[in-house]
Swiss-Prot record:
Residue ranges that the UniProt entry lists as topological domain Cytoplasmic: 1-51, 102-113, 163-186, 275-294
Disulfide bonding pattern of the chain: none
The species this protein was found in: Mus musculus
Record keyword Ion transport present: no
Identification of the protein by name: Membrane progestin receptor gamma
Function: Plasma membrane progesterone (P4) receptor coupled to G proteins. Seems to act through a G(i) mediated pathway. May be involved in oocyte maturation.
Keyword line: Cell membrane, Developmental protein, Differentiation, Lipid-binding, Membrane, Oogenesis, Receptor, Steroid-binding, Transmembrane, Transmembrane helix
Length: 330
């Protein structure tokens, strides 16, 4: 009878420092795991297991939402719905990339970095998908067709490219300058999100009368609140920082961060769908829908330059002497 032996787990002092997580003492996988061992760890309680499943299960939920939208949309003729489909597609990409990164990050030191480079690229692709949907459906009435509106997606593309580069670069500082590393990585994700959210800020704070007439704004507010909560968990490393070893398997900050991010995406999707439906007639009469070349160009530029960043920093891993990258300065 065929039987599979689950991989052995290790303590924090048994794995290289590049694999250490603040406040997590047990449940580490072998730092040179095979791909098979990584996949088997999906069904073993490690300190990464729930990190994987908290994005892998929602991935299938978002795929279902995307496929349902495809089924009811006349893709060829309904150009008004194209930005929504692009957004929903990118909402499937980032949870899958995150799950894969957490699954295979224990194959080697360099594999760990490359996995997260790809994860950062996927997050930024989702950021661009959000910007495209916001541009199409959520802009305040007073700013539709303004210069800001015309430049909004182009600058969102630039933001994703810079953000991918900055977040990848931050990994090279992870051991030598951990505080700077965390600061740069938070900044890398915060400023594209802030740019993407400017239309929502306008509607909330500068055009409150318009906001009160649109029920989508309640979902936008909930989305922002959940995103702030996700940012807190990502930055603070709570609760495990207060009780090292107590939350190694269940309840540590990265798991809570994943849950908050997924809930934020769900709320954001509901808000955009409501804006798309409630404002359809006005937007079609007032603004021009995105053309296919515009959407394709934005997505391709993001993908090409983000992949270029990932390839550049991945190659740099093999050019930098190992002690400089993987050992802490003394």
């Amino acid at each position: 009878m065929l039987s599979l032996k689950l991989p052995r787990l290790f303590r924090i002092d048994q794995v290289p420092q590049v694999f250490h997580e603040q406040g997590i003492l047990f449940g580490y996988r072998h730092p040179q795991s095979s791909a098979t061992a990584c996949i088997l760890s999906l069904f073993q309680m490690t300190n990464e297991t729930l990190n994987i499943w908290t994005h892998l299960l929602p991935f299938w939920f978002f795929v279902w939402r995307f496929m349902t939208a495809l089924y009811v949309t006349d893709i060829q003729n309904d150009s008004y719905s194209w930005p929504m489909l692009v957004y929903m597609c990118t909402s499937c990409v980032y949870p899958l990339a995150s799950s894969c990164a957490h699954t295979f990050s224990s194959m080697s030191k360099n594999a760990r970095h490359i996995c997260y480079f790809l994860d950062y690229g996927a997050v930024n692709l989702f950021s661009l998908g959000s910007a495209i949907a916001y541009s199409a459906y959520t802009f305040p009435d007073a700013l539709v067709c303004s210069t800001f509106h015309e430049c909004y997606v182009a600058l969102a593309v630039l933001n994703t490219i810079l953000s991918t580069g900055l977040s990848c670069y931050s990994r090279f500082l992870e051991l030598q300058k951990p505080r700077l590393c965390k600061l740069l990585r938070v900044l890398a994700f915060a400023y594209p999100y802030t740019w993407d959210s400017l239309p929502i800020f306008y509607r909330l704070f500068l055009f409150p009368g318009e906001s009160s007439r649109n029920e989508a704004m309640l979902y936008h507010q909930k989305h922002m609140g959940m995103t702030l909560l996700a940012s807190f968990f990502y930055s603070a490393h709570l609760p495990e920082r207060l009780a090292p070893g107590r939350f190694d398997y269940i309840g540590h900050s990265h798991q809570l961060f994943h849950v908050c991010v997924i809930l934020a995406t769900h709320l954001q999707m509901e808000a955009i769908l409501l804006d798309k439906t409630l404002r359809r007639e006005w937007l079609l009469a007032t603004s021009r829908p995105f053309s296919f070349p515009q959407i394709a160009a934005a997505m391709l530029l993001c993908i090409i330059f983000s992949l270029s960043n990932i390839i550049y920093f991945s190659a740099a891993l093999y050019r930098i002497p190992e002690p400089e990258l993987h050992e802490k300065e003394t």
